[in-house]
Amino acid sequence: MAKSKPHSRVLQMFKRGEKLQGIIFLDNYNGAYPYYGEVHHGAKIYTSENFVDEDFVEQWIDQKFNEIIGGDK
């Protein structure tokens, strides 16, 4: 089974009206850092071009959401 991208999984959860924890990347003096906080229906995930690379960001997001939803079993 193909692994869905975290953004798609998050969007599906939002569409179902689920309230869950999300990751927002905020700019700071060093470029960006991960902020782990609550997001609600309709929230967006922000990324910074200065933050490592897209693959790392996606893996990090996926790991955090797996911790929340109990992983892909």
Label every PLM stretch briefly.
Residues 1-36:
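Short N-terminal "domain-start" leader segments
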Residues 11, 58-69:
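Residue-level detector of alpha-helical secondary structure
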Residues 1-5, 66-73:
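Short intrinsically disordered terminal tails
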Residues 24-25, 46, 62, 69-70:
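Residues marking helix boundaries in flexible regions
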Residues 42-56:
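A short, exposed loop/beta-hairpin motif centered on an aromatic-Gly-Thr core
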